[in-house]
UniProtKB/Swiss-Prot annotation:
Protein family per UniProt: Belongs to the TRAFAC class TrmE-Era-EngA-EngB-Septin-like GTPase superfamily. TrmE GTPase family.
Species assigned in the record: Chlorobium luteolum (strain DSM 273 / BCRC 81028 / 2530) (Pelodictyon luteolum)
Protein name per the record: tRNA modification GTPase MnmE
Database matches in CDD domains: trmE, TrmE_N
Enzyme class: hydrolase
Gene designation: mnmE
Amino acid sequence: MPASVVLQQPDIPIAAIATPVGVGALAIVRMSGKGVFGIADRAFRKKSGKAFSFEAAEGFTAHVGTLFDGEGMVDEVVALVFRAPSSFTMEDMVEFTCHGGPVVVRRVLAALLDGGCRLAEPGEFTRRAFLNGRIDLLQAEAIGEMIHARTDGAFRTAVTQMQGGLSRRLLEMREGLLQSCALLELELDFSEEDVEFQSREELRGEVIRLQTELSGLVDSYQHGRLLSEGVSTVIAGRPNAGKSTLLNKLLGEERSIVSHMPGTTRDYIEECFVYDKTMFRLTDTAGLRESEEDVEHEGIERSYRKISEADLILYMLDVSGEGFREEAVSAAALCAGHPEARMILLANKTDLVKDSALRIAALETAAGSPVVPMAARSGEGIEELKLLMASMVEGLDKLHEASVLVTSLRHYEALRNASDALHNALGLIEGGEATELIAFELRSALDYVGEITGKVVSEELLNTIFGQFCIGK
């Protein structure tokens, strides 16, 4: 357990519903901590009628019986027994599988709370697993990512992290940093004797090796982010170009208001859809134009901010009127201001003109980006657009197979800080600076790596991480 945090109320067992709330065939209510076997004994009767005690039961065993509360029988249940330290939380645990009706589940939970448990905080079971040493902080976060994964690639990346893939890499780096720090500390302790326990050339080589490893992980975040969060895809264009219609067609539902009146979308709307194993986070933005109205103007400003953050820009033009060539040039200039983003021009309303082929050729020349002709209202061109979107991120779903990926902004920032500290240390070594200064930078890098795995952690950070979990996890 990290020295800076302690387990809250360790003597009070916790209980919570572990399955989604609602109507279902089955549900699970679990409890963990000291005294859970006694609580279970008071609420449970074995179906066979034979005397039974959870205190005496072996771990990893299942028992069929009836659960009671103060009003009588609640439900027939299956009780699973997990004995410390061989449970998820490394504490004694009991899980009751009951029927999935909301009244049944609520009464099962109430019986355990009346018996002496308190209601678990969000993520508290996983938090206890971390604090008791069952998993590190990376693995705890991976559990949350696995639960919320929307694609196979994101799921498999989370599984790799949960199994310790990234943890092992960081542990190896941490051992290297610890070794170098220890040798520098020895030098400081014996400074009067003017000895080097590790030559500066050897230290330089070790720092370069560690920084190269860290830089590789930092660089992997760009792809890891796309796998975990999805490809940020902004639908942009002037008012009444058909942006909201496109969003609805891509989603297959009426999510955005469609109107012939320009300026209907005053703020951006975000939704996700998965195509060819890749998740796209779609943002339907307010139409880009000059506006004197405060509300619409703010929506347009937000549109520009979303465009600046996008991985992919779907710029929609109405080719049924005049000025579309000039707008294509403006769209290209807009995208050029964000070179990390890619753009697809959508030539909408081609069904309303006879010379659509000529107009599309003019767009390709003007913008230098791929052009998809479409009639969004009828759905023409939607499948071609999806194929092009998928081709632009081709191979993303297989990235998890090649290496360990960083998917969390928190991990990315800590790794970048650690890499910066090693960069500073390398400059000090090459400049022949004092041992104290070099040691300070190496210790900083060590602390940043420790922040990721949980070796260096605060109560506030744990509350932020585990507060994003559901109560029963």
